[in-house]
Amino acid sequence: MRLDQAIAARFPDLSRRKARELIAAGRVLVNQRPVRVASRFVADSDQLTVAGDLPAIEVLASGDDWVAVNKPAGMPVQPTRDRATLSLEEMLRVEHREIFLVHRLDTPTSGVVLFARTREAAAQFSELFAGGAIRKTYLAVIGGTIERETTIDAPIDGKEALTIVRPLRDSLVEVEIKTGRTHQIRVHLASIGHPVAGDRRYGGPSAPRLMLHAWKLQHESIGEIEAPIPPELSDRWPGGASPPPVAPGFPRAE
């Protein structure tokens, strides 16, 4: 069946004419990749996604072979079984035919996510992340307060996991992770009795959202990339002061 016919058949609210318009605009994805040819044949087993009017994704910085964007809280990084929500990866593929995810954030976490533009760059960045060469700094609101910098060195699922927590103000903390285990920050903070606010899974105090934000990525290949701090976290800075720098020596990415 032609793609425009398949879209009209699977999405009763869309006419075939509207389907062709969406296809031409690059807002129809076949198996997670945009297709702009209405006459393309698709099989019943092909996964079709209609992007419609896409929300704007803020590009924080970019290079020849990479792009960094600001992920909103609640948006999955990758396609999920629940097709009701379009993923960040799918939306970027509308604009960038070739895009490769090199690390992940949990769906409820906001902040900077790095994508590669080529397979070669993806392999290189994946290796850098796996080896801990790219510095990853988060902001979190936790249950209770901590008085001094705390290092949590505790395996997760049998694998090494290292987290450094620095108090900023009241329950706001800066978190640096040296490894990248699943839910690492959430697991480690809960393990010391200070779960992330809004984290139902690990017993965090009530909050409008998971109060965890991927603030900065730093490496000589990308410079320093910073995601704007959401109001629910930035409101906690005293007297409108600017957040403290994470580390010197990295030029800010433009």
Regions found by a protein language model. Give the residues of each.
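RNA pseudouridine synthases
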Residues: 1-160, 211, 231-254
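Pseudouridine synthase
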Residues: 19, 84-92, 118-121, 170-223, ...
